[in-house]
């Protein structure tokens, strides 16, 4: 009896895009006899399994966890530049991803390149024969459950991640817009203050220029100030102690009415001076109070130097009448 030895050769087909992918489906690679007679698997699956199973490439691609039911491409650049050219005739990572999708692999993590297939398990090479390639143009009804789930979980996770990123960017944009509005409001307020300061400086400059051209203005102001001090001293001596007296500004305006015979230019200059002094009225009142207090102290000293006993009865009577006149409302 003659015995013949039949050697089963492995036919290698490199799967690429387009027509070359169809050639891979037409020429599957038979697996070793240990995996079962007649079992065949696509070269793409065999080479992918070998890359993942090789411990020397764990830094680039390896099994995803202790269960070894998924694999992770840790470094896509090194994977495309170093491993793909060794097993395929291309170095295109996108083409590799399309091939995974064709054979029913799904992306199981939105944060890393992790893929899984229920028949692609570590140490179980014989299960590769159960993975079938999806046909182009096949209807939804003829698609296997693995093909339906292909990329489903990963796609939803990617959409959710993009939605969260969009919401975070929208919140950041709203925060930046609020900061811009606040900065713009502060800038407008600062510009308003600067314009007010410049306007006051111009008014002061104009007033000083007019005062130099008409020296009588300063004399009028000095006389009115002295008159205000004198009137306040009289009120204190009369012991009226009321708070409804005229302010310095009112006294100045009254004095301006008394000197209405002056020229029109001088009156205009005086009005500018009153406007400038209006904001410093409190300081002027304090100064007036100090002058009145000094005058009162001097008057007290003089009264102590001249006792009432030395005054005659007629002089005392005349002084009382003067005080009554000053204290009366008609004064």
Swiss-Prot record:
PANTHER family according to UniProt: HEAT SHOCK TRANSCRIPTION FACTOR, HEAT STRESS TRANSCRIPTION FACTOR A-2
Domain of life the protein comes from: Eukaryota
Motif annotated as AHA1, chain positions: 270-279
Motif AHA2 per UniProt: ranges: 305-313
Motif (Nuclear localization signal): 230-235
Protein name according to UniProt: Putative heat stress transcription factor A-6a
Domain-level remarks: The hydrophobic-rich region (HR-A/B) corresponds to the oligomerization domain. AHA motifs are transcriptional activator elements.
Coiled coil (UniProt feature): 156-238
One Pfam family cited in the UniProt record for this chain: HSF_DNA-bind
Main location: cytoplasm
GO MF terms, alphabetically ordered: DNA-binding transcription factor activity; sequence-specific DNA binding
Region (Disordered): 135-160
Family: Belongs to the HSF family. Class A subfamily.
